[in-house]
Amino acid sequence: MPGRWSAETRLALVRRARRMNRALAQAFPHVYCELDFTTPLELAVATILSAQSTDKRVNLTTPALFARYRTARDYAQADRTELESLIRPTGFYRNKAASLIGLGQALVERFGGEVPATMDKLVTLPGVGRKTANVILGNAFGIPGITVDTHFGRLVRRWRWTTAEDPVKVEQAVGELIERKEWTLLSHRVIFHGRRVCHARRPACGVCVLAKDCPSFGLGPTEPLLAAPLVQGPETDHLLALAGL
């Protein structure tokens, strides 16, 4: 019903967005960063490696990397060839190696070897933009942040929370709809939903907890039995149970 959404007021949009966030919280009660890490430095490194790669691929790569490079100084003094060899499976390994060495050097020279906990300082580091900074702030320091990755941007546009393509504008628009304390969890929920249910080409509309509030309902199969096989991930049984299957 295109008319229903085109006539939506600002207040109605805020209410719908927050209702959808609550539904996502029910669908994904245990969300988390899917990159493996134990320290802010490890998360910064893993997030840099995740560009144009998958979390699964990064998580297969980082155990050996983290065992070899434990501190910012280790990265600052890394042998480039050795570092490139370790991170090669994540793709674009030459650029990423340069970013990691630069990251280590910047942390040693300007921050005493420690990852800073503010946006303005994080974005001055090599390889760290707002997306990476928000991942670090939200998951290593508990500071709310909205992570606009490919899934997040695709879904919030699909939901008509915003029409913006620029990640910074998406972050700002969503931040005005959802309470700040929810930002990090919202980011995880949306990304989980994009990976498991709301796929780019064939979303599982028929089993989606957001169906009644989604302007794009019908892009994928709306019949539950046809949509069910499209659901992916360890939460599949829970998601199908919510759909009555």
UniProtKB/Swiss-Prot annotation:
The keyword Iron-sulfur applies. Keywords: 4Fe-4S, DNA damage, DNA repair, DNA-binding, Glycosidase, Hydrolase, Iron, Iron-sulfur, Lyase, Metal-binding, Multifunctional enzyme. Residues 119-138 form the HhH domain. Pfam families: EndIII_4Fe-2S (PF10576), HHH (PF00633), HhH-GPD (PF00730). One of its GO terms (molecular function) is class I DNA-(apurinic or apyrimidinic site) endonuclease activity. Gene3D superfamilies: Helix-hairpin-Helix base-excision DNA repair enzymes (C-terminal), Hypothetical protein, domain 2. PROSITE patterns: ENDONUCLEASE_III_1, ENDONUCLEASE_III_2. GO terms for cellular component: peptidoglycan-based cell wall; plasma membrane. GO terms for biological process: base-excision repair, AP site formation; DNA repair. [4Fe-4S] cluster binds at residues 198, 205, 208, 214. The keyword Lyase applies. InterPro entries: DNA_glycosylase, Endonuclease-III-like_CS2, Endonuclease3_FeS-loop_motif, Endouclease-III_FeS-bd_BS, HhH-GPD_domain, HhH_base_excis_C, HhH_motif, Nth. Disulfide bonds: none annotated. Its EC number is 4.2.99.18. Binds 1 [4Fe-4S] cluster. NCBIfam families: nth. Belongs to the Nth/MutY family. This is Endonuclease III. It comes from Mycobacterium tuberculosis (strain ATCC 25618 / H37Rv). The gene is nth.
